[in-house]
């Protein structure tokens, strides 16, 4: 396993397992499978409604808590200093843990400055080892950076071969903020798994499209959290540290970048309304 070092010295696995859209009843089994395969970074969120399943897996897996790296996120419905702090305590309870390794603001909406102050408080109290954000465009990230005491360690954003975030990554690096990908397979959009470029490169290395896509991001220093509910695919997604893409491979994959989201713009009024309606 490769690790990245965050801006406060905390080491984070570069490859993890994400539980977005994993049913609460399935989360425990999936996380136990992921941990048994070798995953140590587990990414969840308050809005996923499966923190309890993750917590059950943490309690049952037999792996020391110190060897796991648990990520969760504060949803806008819990924004604001007091409300966010209470929600952090609730997440800790659901996760059956004394601390969260990485806590993120999930969306750049609501009183996220109040939320960030609550996260800083939890950090100072030892309840959180690192704090950061998710879905923050560079302008919002820079503004936040200049107006908080504890600088954001991570920004989790849509990152895959069709939306590579190359320019955005430069800003994150400038502000010592680790880029973390959600949706590394673009949730299958753009006929992702049948992409001829990725198939061709995969054949050359005897690897799958998914493995090539993950390897591309890993070689760019991106943290990735692929999701699968199937144990064999979890194993395949872990099998990406025994080959290297060539410079030519990297340049070829870079040409797939459209520089546009395949999901929704965080500046789209209808999307903002949707996010703020979710509790």
Residue map of PLM features:
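Beta/alpha (TIM)-barrel catalytic core signal, keyed to glycine-rich beta->alpha loops juxtaposed to Asp/Glu
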Residues: 107-279
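Structural motif
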Residues: 33, 37, 94-95, 126, ...
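A short, structured active-site edge motif that brings together acidic residues
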Residues: 65-78, 101-108, 135
């Amino acid at each position: 396993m490769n690790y990245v070092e965050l801006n406060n010295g905390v080491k984070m696995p570069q490859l993890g397992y994400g539980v977005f859209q994993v049913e609460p009843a399935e989360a425990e089994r999936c996380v136990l499978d992921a941990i048994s395969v070798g995953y140590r970074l587990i990414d969840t969120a308050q809005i996923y409604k499966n923190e309890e399943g993750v917590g059950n897996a943490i309690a049952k897996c037999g792996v020391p808590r110190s060897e796991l790296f648990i990520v969760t996120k504060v949803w806008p419905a819990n924004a604001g200093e007091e409300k966010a702090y209470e929600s952090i305590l609730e997440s800790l309870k659901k996760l059956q843990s004394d601390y969260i390794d990485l806590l993120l603001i999930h969306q750049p909406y609501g009183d996220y400055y109040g939320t960030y102050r609550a996260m800083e408080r939890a950090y100072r109290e030892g309840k959180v080892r690192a704090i950061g954000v998710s879905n923050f465009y560079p302008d919002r990230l820079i503004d936040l950076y200049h107006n908080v005491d504890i600088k954001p360690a991570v920004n989790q954003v849509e990152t895959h071969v069709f939306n590579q975030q190359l320019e955005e990554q430069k800003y994150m690096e400038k502000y010592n903020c680790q880029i973390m990908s959600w949706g590394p397979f673009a949730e299958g959009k753009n006929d992702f798994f049948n992409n001829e470029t990725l198939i061709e490169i995969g054949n050359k290395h005897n690897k799958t499209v998914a493995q090539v896509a993950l390897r591309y991001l890993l070689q760019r220093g991106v943290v990735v959290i692929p999701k699968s509910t199937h144990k064999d695919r979890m194993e395949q997604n872990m099998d990406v540290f025994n080959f290297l893409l060539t410079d030519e491979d990297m340049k070829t994959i870079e040409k797939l970048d459209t520089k546009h989201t395949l999901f929704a713009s965080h500046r789209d009024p209808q999307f903002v309304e949707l996010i703020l309606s979710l509790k």
